[in-house]
Design a protein with these regions (language model features):
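ABC-family P-loop ATPase nucleotide-binding domain
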Residues: 1-53, 288-290
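C-terminal boundary and immediately downstream tail of ABC-type ATPase nucleotide-binding domains
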Residues: 22, 265-290
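ABC family nucleotide-binding domain
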Residues: 42-264
Length: 290
């Protein structure tokens, strides 16, 4: 470790107590998320998925997927590993090209767009593996998008990044590199980076799956506060408590299809489909045996 890194590490350790206090998000600040993320009094469909299918080689991963996301929705997608959840999210973000079907964003079929990067400015993604630039500082990770894509000036991009780093309790770590952060801290930086692009929708692909158990709560708390602020979110998750308490719609997938969807209370207390019941029973058993 270089002298500079050692000094930064010592400084970060000295700030740990302060950061833990800052992790509880300032409710006043969070209500200032850009208006595009606020919940309208009347619901408006932002994303409509119609007859979506995806085939890799001879394997049909997604089959005839249909669902809508309205402004302010928190949609949690649950299901066993390999059920197609993450592939669906990657199709919605156009990281994967659907084999068939349409994805409408404000009524426009984005599967036919020639400007996927422009679309991703409004529908951005937080990955399970963070995907931070290891050679850049925390602040630079959060300003590179606004500066390169949104063409913000340096001072403006810094101000936007600091706003959201403060929001997620990471403003004291702006000079740190990702290797100096815990998994939970990296994911909070990734969330701040996504927010800095002023998106209308954030897609979360199992954002806690790569974290140690003690780090999960801090990330879920940030996401809960964002949901309460009216940010539209689609979350692939194995965190059933989060899905039950925070989502307003839960989608259960199995074998590449949507088996059942509905309000959390209906899905978790009186699911209609046997496959849904079996999955939830397995999840409950795993939690009890953990």
């Amino acid at each position: 470790m270089t002298t500079t890194d050692a000094n930064t590490s010592r400084q970060n350790e000295e700030n740990t107590e302060q950061i833990m206090e800052n992790t509880a998000i300032d409710t006043q600040n969070i209500t200032n998320i850009d208006n595009t993320a606020q919940l309208d009094s009347q619901s408006e469909s932002i994303i409509e998925v119609r007859h979506l299918g995806k085939i890799f080689g001879t394997h049909e991963v997604l089959k005839d997927i249909d669902f809508d996301v309205q402004k302010g929705d928190v949609t949690c997608i649950i299901g066993s590993s390999g059920s197609g959840k993450s592939t669906l999210l990657r199709c919605i973000n156009l990281f994967e090209t659907p084999t068939v079907g349409e994805i409408y964003f404000h009524g426009e079929d984005v599967t036919k767009t020639k400007s996927a990067p422009k679309y991703r400015e409004k529908v951005t993604m937080v990955f399970q593996s963070f995907n931070l630039f290891n050679n850049l500082s925390v602040l630079a990770n959060c300003t590179i998008g606004p500066r390169k894509v949104l063409k913000m000036k340096k001072d403006e991009a810094n101000a936007v990044a600091m706003k959201y780093l403060e929001l997620v309790g990471m403003s004291a770590y702006i000079n740190a590199k990702p290797r100096q952060l815990s998994g939970g801290q990296k994911q909070r930086v990734a969330i701040a980076r996504a927010l800095a692009m002023s998106p209308e929708v954030i897609l979360f692909d199992e954002p806690t799956s790569a974290l140690d158990p003690e780090m999960v709560g801090e990330v879920l708390e940030v996401m809960k506060e964002l949901a309460e602020a009216g940010l539209t979110m689609i979350v692939v998750t194995h965190e059933m408590t989060f899905a039950r308490d925070v989502a307003n719609k839960v989608v259960f997938m199995d074998g590449g299809v949507i088996v059942e969807e509905g309000a959390p209370e209906q899905i978790f207390t009186s699911p209609k489909e046997e496959r849904t019941k079996a999955f939830l029973s397995r999840m409950l058993a795993e939690k009890q045996n953990a």
